[in-house]
């Protein structure tokens, strides 16, 4: 497995594989890899001849400097995991390589609508950072496909819109959420949880599934349902951040025409911001 830090060397390897007729998959990550990331690599491996994983903690998508500073950097361990899983190349650039003129002078990519709604409304600039780094990676690697986790539901929708709008001939593959046995969605930020908080954390998933059951039963009093969930989260020790029930295809409010809903949840538990989502079929 190759470990490369510069765009020049990355392009050289990509060019060689292209000349050999290889099908290339990209798995973008911010490192601190867990089993959820490994399923992305597995999916990429099953669909392509070459798997390129990026490990880059992207400063442009952090709105809080303290959050950026404490995000775990575990490159050596990440590379060992990726090597064992069969990745062919790890692109691990420094911020100076990706943003040589600094963030303030960096050309950026913004996806209208999706960047500023829902999670984007409370995290200004976050999705601009996501769209910019993903665009850079797409331009550098020019993959046939790219794998992203469905845990970041709005991010996945944004990247699909980005690919359509910018004309990228790239298959965007969504990979299902990987969960611990108790239901907690795997996340790099789970490492911020204390032992006691880790015991409480699955309640986010449990409350989400209870909400799903209410939707299955035909309850459409969305505001009341969300307030009930928020109160239960607070009682359990969480600080609710974002709670939405949207049309799964448009991320707009549910309408009579909606056939699928998505529950989007984010809540703080101690120092960890936990996110999760679940889709609900409204036609049954």
UniProtKB/Swiss-Prot annotation:
Its UniProt pathway annotation is: Cofactor biosynthesis; (R)-pantothenate biosynthesis; (R)-pantothenate from (R)-pantoate and beta-alanine: step 1/1
Q: Which residues bind ATP?
A: 30-37, 149-152, 178, 186-189
Q: Name one GO biological process term.
A: pantothenate biosynthetic process
Which residues carry out catalysis? Answer: 37 (proton donor)
Location(s), subcellular = Cytoplasm
Annotated disulfide bonds: none
Keyword Cytoplasm in the entry? The reply is: yes
- Which residues participate in beta-alanine binding? 61
Record key words, sorted = ATP-binding, Cytoplasm, Ligase, Nucleotide-binding, Pantothenate biosynthesis
Query: GO MF annotations for this entry?
Result: ATP binding; pantoate-beta-alanine ligase activity
Coiled coil residues, start to end: none
Q: Where is the major localization of this protein?
A: cytoplasm
Catalyzed chemical reaction(s): (R)-pantoate + beta-alanine + ATP = (R)-pantothenate + AMP + diphosphate + H(+)
According to its record, what are the GO cellular component terms?
Answer: cytosol
The EC number(s) this enzyme carries: 6.3.2.1
Instruction: Report whether Cell membrane shows up as a keyword of the record.
Output: no
Out of the domains of life, which is the source?
A: Bacteria
**Residues binding (R)-pantoate:** 61, 155
Q: What is the annotated role of this protein in its UniProt record? A: Catalyzes the condensation of pantoate with beta-alanine in an ATP-dependent reaction via a pantoyl-adenylate intermediate.
Miscellaneous notes for this chain?
A: The reaction proceeds by a bi uni uni bi ping pong mechanism.
Annotated NCBIfam families: panC
Describe, as the record does, how this protein assembles with itself and its partners: Homodimer.
Q: Which family does it belong to?
A: Belongs to the pantothenate synthetase family.
This chain belongs to which protein, by name? Answer: Pantothenate synthetase
**Organism from which the protein derives:** Pectobacterium atrosepticum (strain SCRI 1043 / ATCC BAA-672)
